[in-house]
Amino acid sequence: MTKVSVLVAVYNTADYLPQCLDSLLAQTMTDIEVLCVDDGSTDASPAILQQYVERDQRVKPTFLKENTGLAHARNVALRQATGEYVCFVDSDDWLATDALEKVYDTFEDGVDTVLFRVVLHFTDGREKEYKMKPFETLTGEEAFKESLTWKIHGVYAVGR
């Protein structure tokens, strides 16, 4: 069984998609699958995905004919996932090279969900860290309530 399935919903992000995919394929943890669901993009995103499929068999695309929305695209990818754990990444995100290895190790310690530190990178070169709550263990109900007020959100991974 694959250790981590990375689910990437793609919609008109040709300008960012290569950096996203490069960051996923450069992970120190190599036992991953990258499930990309193109949600009816009208830009070069489908062609970019096809280029990556030819370079690396871990990239597994699905092409939807029309835009059905983020939730549907993620659900399509989730149904295809074979990993022990799943990580949701937007197609304009990129991860540090050891991110998935750290996530996997954290799951092996018995947690249910991992939230990532988020740093926003702007096209003019500025960076801004998204301020989230300091690390703590929350129950599912507490985490849900915190997410409603945007105190926690971002890139995340969950156990299956």
Residue ranges and their predicted role:
Residues M1-R160:
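Nucleotide-sugar donor-binding/catalytic module of glycosyltransferases
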